[in-house]
């Protein structure tokens, strides 16, 4: 069984008298920067000129500079930018300032694993990937807790890359919850697979198909929305808290029986074969090449898909229903 590492296993002193550059100040960026700062680490935030996030970072008392300036002064550079822009920013703003002994870090292995970013041989290359959104990484830290993280070493030029990755994970609160060692390849391929087959692609396709089936059969769209989308969170919360067993222990016998007898008719052997094809596309780099080329060509197809999905009837029904949820408007 995989081992989890905790506070006692990591040495935050490895970051003392060091400067950490956080490149990007979005969901993960703001959480990493603030948590490290509150852990006693010297932090500088690197942003492009005119970034709307600069003022937010300054209001938190953080030092904000250009990406190039941050990369120049930092000992450890954590890149927390969208996958599709990392290569350009790295080549133009970061690479010229990478000196022997520095550390370049990522929260996802995409650009390293698929060779979009190829660091020089004399720097450490590490990954620390919180398994939760940035607001949760920050909130749990302020509560004295943390979000579990994955960590990995791609290149160990200093002989301390692993310890440095664990120290960084401790600085953002990860070792409070537990951190799990992996590789860039394993994290990248499993993360993409989970997103495409289950969490995003699979789930949204299932929700829409269920909604469309009920509406086509003459049921009210509002009821279809409740049954196929709204209640997903209620079920997922139970699964997260105690696995599939707790969920099944919490639902009615009718629902549980339907789970066992009808679920396998939805996820069939044909579905599993398609899952295997998608995994193969990830492993061979086919998906990565497709995604990179889509962005290089201006994202016309991506933009069209976004527009089409935004116009799906479930979105309009959901918008009207959510406006009536008093408990939701208070969040």
Curated annotation (Swiss-Prot):
The active site is at 108. NADP(+) binds at residues 25-28, 51, 53, 83-86, 134. It catalyses: (2R)-2,3-dihydroxy-3-methylbutanoate + NADP(+) = (2S)-2-acetolactate + NADPH + H(+); (2R,3R)-2,3-dihydroxy-3-methylpentanoate + NADP(+) = (S)-2-ethyl-2-hydroxy-3-oxobutanoate + NADPH + H(+). Substrate binds at residue 252. Pfam families: KARI_C, KARI_N. Binds 2 magnesium ions per subunit. One of its GO terms (biological process) is L-valine biosynthetic process. Mg(2+) 1 binds at residues 191, 195. It is an enzyme of class 1 (oxidoreductase). Its cofactor is Mg(2+). Residues 183-328 form the KARI C-terminal knotted domain. Residues 2-182 form the KARI N-terminal Rossmann domain. Pathway: Amino-acid biosynthesis; L-isoleucine biosynthesis; L-isoleucine from 2-oxobutanoate: step 2/4; Amino-acid biosynthesis; L-valine biosynthesis; L-valine from pyruvate: step 2/4. Mg(2+) 2 binds at residues 191, 227, 231. InterPro entries: 6-PGluconate_DH-like_C_sf, KARI, KARI_C, KARI_N, KARI_prok, NAD(P)-bd_dom_sf. Keywords: Amino-acid biosynthesis, Branched-chain amino acid biosynthesis, Magnesium, Metal-binding, NADP, Oxidoreductase. GO terms for molecular function: ketol-acid reductoisomerase activity; magnesium ion binding; NADP binding. One of its GO terms (cellular component) is cytosol. NCBIfam families: ilvC, PRK05479.1, PRK13403.1. Belongs to the ketol-acid reductoisomerase family. Involved in the biosynthesis of branched-chain amino acids (BCAA). Catalyzes an alkyl-migration followed by a ketol-acid reduction of (S)-2-acetolactate (S2AL) to yield (R)-2,3-dihydroxy-isovalerate. In the isomerase reaction, S2AL is rearranged via a Mg-dependent methyl migration to produce 3-hydroxy-3-methyl-2-ketobutyrate (HMKB). In the reductase reaction, this 2-ketoacid undergoes a metal-dependent reduction by NADPH to yield (R)-2,3-dihydroxy-isovalerate. This is Ketol-acid reductoisomerase (NADP(+)). The gene is ilvC.
